[in-house]
C-alpha cells in the first residue's frame, strides 16, 4: 500500500496543480473519484494487468469512463496507462484529496462512536476540534458497538480515546501492574 502511495503522490500533485491552475478542483476531484472506482473493479483490474498495449488499455479505460472525463482527464489516464500506473488510481484519488485538504487547511477528523451520533453531537465535536486544531475540520463518523459508550477521535497521528472500552482497558492495565 505504501508503495502505491509513493507512486500516486506525484500524479496526484500534478493533477492538483493543474486543477488549481484551471480553477477546476471540484471537476478533477469528481473525475479522479470516478476513475478510481472504475480502477477498483475486479474485471478492469484484470484487464489492466493482463494487457500489454498501453494505448489499448487507455482507450478501453476512457471508453468505460465515458463523459465522466474531459480531454485533460483523458490525457491524464493515457499518461498513467503508458507508465502502467492505472492500478494506482485509488491512491491517486486519496492523495489528491489529502493535498486538497492541506491546501484548503482542512483537517480530517475520524470519530468512532458506540452508537450513531446526532447532528448536534457531530457539530459539537466539529466545533471543539476546529478550535483545538485551529483549522477547518472534516468529520467522518463510524460506529463500533464494542466501544460500549463514548467516542474515539483520530486526526493526524493523534488518538483521543474517550470510550468506555478504553477506560476499562486502562483500568485493567493499572490493576495488573
Swiss-Prot record:
Its main location: membrane. One of its GO terms (molecular function) is proton-transporting ATP synthase activity, rotational mechanism. Keywords: ATP synthesis, Cell inner membrane, Cell membrane, CF(1), Hydrogen ion transport, Ion transport, Membrane, Transport. It comes from the Bacteria. It is found in: Cell inner membrane. The keyword Flavoprotein does not apply. InterPro entries: ATP_synth_OSCP/delta_N_sf, ATPase_OSCP/dsu. One of its GO terms (cellular component) is proton-transporting ATP synthase complex. It is a peripheral membrane protein. F-type ATPases have 2 components, F(1) - the catalytic core - and F(0) - the membrane proton channel. F(1) has five subunits: alpha(3), beta(3), gamma(1), delta(1), epsilon(1). F(0) has three main subunits: a(1), b(2) and c(10-14). The alpha and beta chains form an alternating ring which encloses part of the gamma chain. F(1) is attached to F(0) by a central stalk formed by the gamma and epsilon chains, while a peripheral stalk is formed by the delta and b chains. Belongs to the ATPase delta chain family. PANTHER family: ATP SYNTHASE DELTA CHAIN (PTHR11910). F(1)F(0) ATP synthase produces ATP from ADP in the presence of a proton or sodium gradient. F-type ATPases consist of two structural domains, F(1) containing the extramembraneous catalytic core and F(0) containing the membrane proton channel, linked together by a central stalk and a peripheral stalk. During catalysis, ATP synthesis in the catalytic domain of F(1) is coupled via a rotary mechanism of the central stalk subunits to proton translocation. This protein is part of the stalk that links CF(0) to CF(1). It either transmits conformational changes from CF(0) to CF(1) or is implicated in proton conduction. HAMAP family: ATP_synth_delta_bact. This is ATP synthase subunit delta. It comes from Glaesserella parasuis serovar 5 (strain SH0165). The gene is atpH.
Amino acid at each position: 500500500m505504501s508503495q502505491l502511495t509513493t507512486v500516486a503522490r506525484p500524479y496526484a500533485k500534478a493533477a492538483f496543480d493543474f486543477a488549481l491552475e484551471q480553477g477546476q478542483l471540484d471537476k478533477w476531484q469528481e473525475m479522479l473519484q470516478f476513475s478510481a472506482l472504475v480502477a477498483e473493479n475486479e474485471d478492469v483490474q484484470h484487464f489492466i494487468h493482463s494487457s500489454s498495449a498501453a494505448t489499448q488499455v487507455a482507450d478501453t479505460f476512457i471508453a468505460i469512463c465515458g463523459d465522466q472525463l474531459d480531454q485533460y482527464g483523458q490525457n491524464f489516464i493515457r499518461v498513467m496507462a503508458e507508465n502502467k500506473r492505472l492500478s494506482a488510481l485509488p491512491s491517486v484519488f486519496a492523495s489528491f484529496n489529502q493535498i486538497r485538504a492541506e491546501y484548503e487547511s482542512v483537517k480530517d477528523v475520524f470519530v468512532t462512536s458506540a452508537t450513531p451520533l446526532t447532528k448536534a453531537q457531530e457539530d459539537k465535536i466539529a466545533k471543539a476540534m476546529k478550535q483545538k486544531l485551529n483549522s477547518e475540520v472534516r468529520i467522518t463518523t463510524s460506529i463500533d458497538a464494542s466501544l460500549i459508550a463514548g467516542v474515539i477521535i483520530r486526526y493526524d497521528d493523534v488518538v483521543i480515546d474517550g470510550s468506555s472500552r478504553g477506560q476499562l482497558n486502562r483500568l485493567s492495565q493499572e490493576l495488573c501492574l
